[in-house]
Amino acid sequence: MNIVENEICIRTLIDDDFPLMLKWLTDERVLEFYGGRDKKYTLESLKKHYTEPWEDEVFRVIIEYNNVPIGYGQIYKMYDELYTDYHYPKTDEIVYGMDQFIGEPNYWSKGIGTRYIKLIFEFLKKERNANAVILDPHKNNPRAIRAYQKSGFRIIEDLPEHELHEGKKEDCYLMEYRYDDNATNVKAMKYLIEHYFDNFKVDSIEIIGSGYDSVAYLVNNEYIFKTKFSTNKKKGYAKEKAIYNFLNTNLETNVKIPNIEYSYISDELSILGYKEIKGTFLTPEIYSTMSEEEQNLLKRDIASFLRQMHGLDYTDISECTIDNKQNVLEEYILLRETIYNDLTDIEKDYIESFMERLNATTVFEGKKCLCHNDFSCNHLLLDGNNRLTGIIDFGDSGIIDEYCDFIYLLEDSEEEIGTNFGEDILRMYGNIDIEKAKEYQDIVEEYYPIETIVYGIKNIKQEFIENGRKEIYKRTYKD
């Protein structure tokens, strides 16, 4: 093996490396985490150990940084005995295990291990078509665990008394990196649920939906568990939980909303769990099959729910206020401070034209109230009689412009029912300026490509930046 990227080189272990390996593996700072300080290697015993035959394919490598050897790694294809040892089910998938150490303490905590692991991921996918990679760090080695998590590994199981280390059986984690669904790894989510919620046993789990920064799972065919992994995960789920609690206390309606039974909220991880609300999600296709009477009853259900929610005294959750216009102004500043100068004249013209419209409009000066703020068909559940029975996903909710809950109801698209549907609901809702609601919807729609670019900047996702820029061109030349 010979992989070179910038300062890092990963090459095959050779005989000339063993004196340096002996130096590393007689350093107690290294042995504390790799091998154990009770190991007493000689050059001969070290050579024997690190050249012994392997059951299947193995790569033994030296890690170099700026041409200086600083560590060792081994990557091996899993075989029967290892599957049993790791408690990892054997399937037709191609799975590799790995372990490694940085033998020069001066190079610890510099991100080199993380970069090394990502290069190995790339190699195993490209050269071996691997499906997954696993490893089993000691639980008492938090520095290594953090590095593995930064690389993409996720904890999927506890391995109690798994590895003999300095005369004691050490507890370990089984960590996995998957090439197909790593961000949504159901085994990792199963582990998190059982780890953070005592006495909750996961018998079945499946992904039922995902957004830009969150994933939802159906667990035991009864509960919905959501996890958020963006930079605002703690604030986002704390707010969402508070709003669910507020609504369940104050709303007087037969329409169900999530009632949080399980929550874990921290800077590192946030999870919410609630019993699934049964029903069928509203779609344009379902709506088109309904009788006129059923359609009108559904529109009245929606208007009634929104009118009641928008009329609640929100004093107790006033900290959940969202200023859409101010947010856009701040995002414009972020654009100016980051990639604005790299944009084309067409892209800049689109942005500046939008900002002129934003500063001229009065639609942001209307009523503020508690809104869902993502009130679209795929969040509305119907019962067997096509009546509104449930509303989910209040993750974007807050005290905001009244018009925002009509954005999707007024939208003409494959996912939404159309402008006439939204206008009918607005008329049933009453005491609202329908033309201003439509203007608000149009402004939000015009902002969409800019919002996409900003999301990419905030979350360091280049594909969103590129998609937003492409959308500006599509809209500019649509005629």
Curated annotation (Swiss-Prot):
It catalyses: a gentamycin + GTP = a gentamycin 2''-phosphate + GDP + H(+). One of its GO terms (molecular function) is ATP binding. This is Bifunctional AAC/APH. Disulfide bonds: none annotated. GO terms for cellular component: cytoplasm. Residues 8-180 form the N-acetyltransferase domain. Residues 110-153 are annotated as: Acetyl-CoA binding site. One of its GO terms (biological process) is response to antibiotic. Its EC number is 2.3.1.-, 2.7.1.190. It is found in: Cytoplasm. The gene is aacA-aphD. Involved in resistance to gentamicin, tobramycin, and kanamycin. Tobramycin and kanamycin resistance is due to the ACC activity, specified by N-terminal region. The C-terminal region is a kinase that phosphorylates several 4,6-disubstituted aminoglycosides. Keywords: Acyltransferase, Antibiotic resistance, ATP-binding, Cytoplasm, Kinase, Multifunctional enzyme, Nucleotide-binding, Plasmid, Transferase, Transposable element. A gentamycin binds at residue 393.
